[in-house]
């Protein structure tokens, strides 16, 4: 196997295993991404601002919001400035789930850091970020 195929296999295994750490979630990881923004970032978020923050389309965010509304994780609050617009607000249920998810993900990531050591973990983080930037620039968003 050549080095590029080896890296491809490693990336695939890492992606699979990382996604497996989120199997306990009662919602999809992409929907959890919306909740993370709403519960961990300051400010008011409209669907458009959520889409921009996440780097995805507004229709995709709208679909996520609709699911989260039905499941009781978010509520809509009319904008006082623009009657056509609304803010998406997390519910207490969303905050509780975000807290639980953060604790579990931190546990997994700390385990990786403990196994690698502080220096290798920092290097891994830096290299993964660089690789993500390159891939992000190459794919059609």
Locate each region found by the language model.
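Pre-recognition alpha-helix immediately N-terminal to the DNA-recognition helix
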Residues: 6, 33-37, 96
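C-terminal regulatory/oligomerization modules of transcriptional regulators
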Residues: 1, 119-141
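N-terminal positioning helix adjacent to the helix-turn-helix/winged-helix DNA-binding module
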Residues: 3, 30-31, 46, 93, ...
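N-terminal helix-turn-helix DNA-binding core of bacterial DNA-binding proteins
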Residues: 16-60
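N-terminal leader segment of winged-helix/HTH proteins
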Residues: 1-25
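Charged, amphipathic alpha-helical coiled-coil/dimerization segments
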Residues: 67-126
């Amino acid at each position: 196997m050549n080095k590029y195929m080896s890296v491809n296999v490693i990336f695939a295994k890492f992606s699979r295993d990382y996604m497996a750490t989120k199997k306990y979630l009662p919602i999809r990881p992409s929907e959890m991404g919306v909740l993370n923004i709403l519960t961990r970032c300051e400010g008011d978020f409209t669907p458009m601002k959520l889409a921009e923050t996440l780097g995805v389309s507004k229709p995709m965010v709208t679909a996520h919001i609709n699911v989260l509304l039905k499941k009781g994780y978010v509520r809509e609050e009319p904008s006082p400035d623009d009657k056509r617009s609304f803010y998406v607000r997390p519910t207490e249920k969303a905050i509780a789930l975000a807290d639980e998810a953060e604790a579990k993900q931190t546990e997994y990531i700390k385990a990786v850091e403990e196994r690698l050591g502080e220096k290798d973990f920092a290097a891994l983080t830096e290299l993964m970020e660089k690789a993500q930037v390159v891939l992000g620039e190459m794919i059609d968003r």
